A protein has these predicted regions:
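Walker A/P-loop phosphate-binding motif and the immediately C-terminal alpha-helix
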Residues: 90-94, 104-145, 151-153, 167, ...
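Phosphate-binding loop that captures ATP/GTP phosphates
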Residues: 132-189
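Phosphate-binding/switch loop-helix module in NTP-utilizing enzymes
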Residues: 185, 190-232
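Conserved C-terminal guanine-recognition region of P-loop GTPase G domains, centered on the G4
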Residues: 259-275
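Beta-strand-loop-alpha "switch" segments that mediate conformational coupling across diverse proteins
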Residues: 284-329
Length: 357
């Protein structure tokens, strides 16, 4: 009201609220109620039963895994937790993408028209990341008719090949299939190609489809390491059944031209959906500057495909032998994790409209 003096800040601080005016009974009074056999006063007054959902939750920060943040957390006995760094949060996000669920099974074909650009190495790299981070089964199939070397990248645990798997009429369980595969330290399994060049060349589209029908029953992610020839019989089945392509290129001009020619051929032969969904991998074959400006290659392939990733040179990968993720340089491993996360972004897509099965 006009002329009425406003309360001072001290009065705001000490003024009783409506809830405070309903004074709670003194603890001594409650004690006397119990002593006299009287029922204690019920809370809350409105008779609503409290729920655990009403209790505010405080989520503890995750402990940092590296750097000065981890040192501070360790030295303080956990009393001081700076939280995870931006890099650790980014890695956590990549891992979550890689671990997202798959609709049934997911099939990835890795291919290149040019040999020696790291196709088999990339197949092993992606597969190893998936197998080590995910909890389900991941397998790579060697469909190279020209004496594929995929099985040389894992400890050899069996002499079986795709041909032996096809001839086995007693496959009823995962254990029956496992007898035909070798497994890397990452948990990635490999099904070897036929070692006889004549028999390998005769590996047909129908036989590839039969192999996939078996593997689909027991594996969540199936990678196929293709040969360099697009006209080989099995390639028709590979391209028809693949959900996504990983196209391998080197940073040299001839490698880039071969990758571009592969995209052209796929588009002309009814696989334009695979081109649009393809992930291009540019492998750097040696230390130092690449022969072609990487940014120009990125721009060219991004205009046609879903993503482009560059994998740095790594001496362990260059050995061409068994791949151990623990021996990779941290930058190489990070690049492979990012590549796997990009491929995994397509896991939730419904590919049934593209045919296959």
């Amino acid at each position: 009201m006009p002329g009425q003096q406003a309360p001072s800040p001290e009065q705001y601080q000490h003024a009783p609220t409506p809830q405070a005016q309903q004074q709670a009974p003194h603890p001594q009074a409650q004690y006397q109620q119990y002593q006299q056999g009287q029922p204690p006063q019920q809370y809350p007054p409105n008779g609503v039963t409290p729920s655990l959902e009403d209790v505010p939750m405080r989520r503890a920060k995750k402990a940092p895994g590296s750097g000065w943040r981890r040192a501070v957390h360790h030295m303080s006995g956990g009393a001081i937790n700076p939280g995870m760094s931006a890099e650790e949060l980014r890695l956590q996000e990549l891992v979550a993408r890689i671990r997202q669920p798959v609709r049934g099974d997911y099939r990835i074909a890795t291919l290149s028209l040019k040999g020696g650009v790291g196709k088999t190495t990339t197949t092993m790299g992606i597969g190893s990341i998936f197998a080590s981070i995910r909890g389900d089964r991941v397998i790579a199939v060697d469909a190279n008719p020209d004496f594929g070397t995929l099985s040389q990248r894992v400890p050899l645990q069996t002499r079986s090949t795709v041909r032996d798997l096809l001839l086995d009429q007693q496959i009823r369980s995962y254990g029956d299939v496992r007898r035909h595969t070798s497994q890397a330290t990452s948990r990635l399994e490999v099904l070897a190609s036929e070692r006889d060049p004549a028999a390998s060349e005769s590996f047909s589209e129908d036989e590839y489809r039969q192999v996939l029908r078996v593997l689909q029953r027991f594996y969540n992610i199936i990678l196929t390491d293709c040969g360099t020839g697009l006209m080989h019989s099995a390639m028709a089945g590979v391209l028809d059944l693949a959900h996504s392509l990983v196209l391998i290129s080197s940073s040299a001009i001839d490698g880039a031209r071969s990758a571009a020619a592969t995209l052209d051929w796929l588009s002309l032969h009814g696989h334009d959906h695979l081109v649009r969904n393809a992930v291009v991998v540019i492998n750097l074959p040696r230390e130092g500057s690449p022969n072609v400006a990487i940014q120009h290659l990125r721009e060219y392939f991004l205009a046609r495909c879903r993503a482009v990733h560059v994998i740095p040179y790594d001496p362990h990968l260059a050995e061409g032998a068994e791949i151990d993720l623990a021996r990779l340089h941290k930058n190489t491993k990070r690049a492979l994790v990012e590549l796997a996360a990009t491929v995994a972004d397509d896991f939730a897509t419904d590919h049934r409209r593209f045919g296959g099965y």
